[in-house]
C-alpha cells in the first residue's frame, strides 16, 4: 500500500530526512516501510497498518519542523513511541514553550510530554519534586527555570545544592581544602549554569552573591527568602536532611528537588529522605510531584537502552528471577 504526504517546503523535507537520511532510515526500519521524496511528496510504501503508523509519525515530525524544531534521532524515537501508544496528537503540546535562552542563544524547552508536565509543576507550585532516571533533564530544566526566574526578577538569588557524600566517599578522606573537596560533587550544577549564563556572567553573579552553589550542610540554620533553590541528587539525603532543607523555605522563594530513587548511595539501614518526602508530601497543596520515565530520556539513545536494561534486571531480581546482587 502507498500513502502520500505533501511537503510544502524543501527545508521541511531536509529537516525530516536528517543528515544522510538517518531520520527517515530509522522510520523505515522501525515500521518496515519505504519512504521516498518525489515531486514535493513523501511516498510511504508498506503494509497498510505500518504505512499508516509511519505517516502519523511523519505528520508529527512535520508539526515539530514547522515550529522551528531541528529534527534529530531523539525526536524521531520519541515520536515513534507516541505513535505506537496512540498519543501522537500530544506532539502539538511540545511546540513553543521556550523556557530559557542559553548563553549561546539556544532555546531551552521541554522535549517530551513528561518534561512539559514537570516544568508546568515547577512554574505553578512553590515546591516541586522531580524524580526519574539519568538523562531525563530534571536538573538541567530546573536550572533553566531558575535562571529565567532570576532574569525576570522574580527572585534575587539562585541557590544550588546537593548532598556532598555519594558513592561511598567521605569528604574527610579526600585531598585539598573544602572547596576542592566539594567541587567534583557540584560539577553538574556548574555545567548547567555555565551553559545558561556563560562562564563570565556566572562568575559575576557568583561574586555578587546572586548565585550560590554549596553542599547541603551549608543550608542548616538559614531562612532563604526571594530565592530559587534546587536540591539535586536528593535520593542521597537522609530523612533529617530533607526535613531540614524543606524548612529553609522563605518568603518569595521556590524549591525544586530532583533525584533518582534507583541510585541511592545511602547505607542500607538509612531511609532516603527523597522517598519519604514523596510519600509524606504527595497531597500537600502547593507541592507538585513529577515522576519522569525512560520515555523522557533525551540523551544518547544508548542511555535510554541502558536505563531500560537495568529496570528489567531490577524487576527480575526483585521477583527472585534475576542473578546475584
Where on the chain are the PLM-derived regions?
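Short glycine-/aliphatic-rich beta-strand segments at the starts of folded cytosolic domains
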Residues: 1-15
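Short amphipathic alpha-helix segments
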Residues: 12-29
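Hydrophobic side chains in well-ordered alpha-helices
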Residues: 16, 23, 54-57, 242-245
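Compact, well-ordered interaction domains used in eukaryotic information-processing assemblies
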Residues: 25, 31-34, 38-40
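Interdomain "pre-motor" coupling segment immediately N-terminal to P-loop NTPase/helicase cores
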Residues: 36-95
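Conserved helicase motor core of SF1/SF2 NTP-dependent helicases
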Residues: 41, 103-231, 235-325
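Intrinsically disordered, low-complexity linkers and terminal tails enriched in Pro/Gly
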Residues: 84-98, 315-325
Amino acid at each position: 500500500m502507498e500513502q502520500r504526504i505533501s511537503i510544502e517546503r524543501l527545508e521541511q523535507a531536509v529537516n525530516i530526512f536528517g543528515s544522510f537520511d538517518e531520520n527517515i532510515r530509522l522510520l523505515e526500519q522501525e515500521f518496515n516501510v519505504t519512504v521516498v521524496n518525489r515531486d514535493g511528496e513523501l511516498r510511504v510504501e508498506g503494509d497498510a497498518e505500518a504505512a499508516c503508523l509511519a505517516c502519523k509519525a511523519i505528520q508529527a515530525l512535520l508539526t515539530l519542523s514547522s515550529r522551528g524544531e531541528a529534527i534529530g534521532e531523539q525526536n524521531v524515537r520519541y515520536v515513534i513511541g507516541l505513535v505506537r501508544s496512540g498519543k501522537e496528537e500530544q506532539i502539538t503540546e511540545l511546540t513553543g514553550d521556550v523556557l530559557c535562552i542559553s548563553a549561546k542563544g539556544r532555546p531551552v524547552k521541554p522535549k517530551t510530554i513528561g518534561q512539559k508536565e514537570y516544568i508546568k509543576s515547577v512554574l505553578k507550585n512553590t515546591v516541586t519534586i522531580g524524580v526519574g532516571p539519568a538523562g531525563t533533564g530534571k536538573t538541567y530544566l530546573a536550572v533553566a527555570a531558575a535562571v529565567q526566574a532570576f532574569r525576570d526578577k522574580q527572585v534575587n538569588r539562585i541557590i544550588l545544592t546537593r548532598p556532598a557524600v555519594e558513592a561511598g566517599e567521605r569528604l574527610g578522606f579526600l585531598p585539598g581544602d573544602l572547596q576542592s573537596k566539594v567541587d567534583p560533587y557540584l560539577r553538574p550544577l556548574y555545567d548547567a549554569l555555565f551553559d545558561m549564563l556563560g562562564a563570565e556572567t556566572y562568575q559575576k553573579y557568583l561574586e555578587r552573591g546572586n548565585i550560590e552553589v554549596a553542599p547541603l550542610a551549608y543550608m542548616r540554620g538559614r531562612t532563604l527568602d526571594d530565592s530559587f533553590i534546587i536540591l539535586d541528587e536528593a535520593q542521597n539525603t537522609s530523612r533529617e536532611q530533607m526535613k531540614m532543607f524543606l524548612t529553609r523555605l522563605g518568603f518569595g522563594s521556590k524549591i525544586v528537588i530532583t533525584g533518582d530513587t534507583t541510585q541511592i548511595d545511602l547505607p542500607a539501614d538509612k531511609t532516603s529522605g527523597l522517598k519519604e518526602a514523596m510519600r509524606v508530601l504527595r497531597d500537600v497543596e502547593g507541592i507538585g510531584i513529577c515522576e519522569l520515565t525512560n520515555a523522557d530520556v533525551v540523551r544518547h539513545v544508548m542511555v535510554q537502552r541502558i536505563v531500560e536494561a537495568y529496570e528489567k534486571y531490577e524487576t527480575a531480581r526483585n521477583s527472585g528471577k534475576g542473578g546475584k546482587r
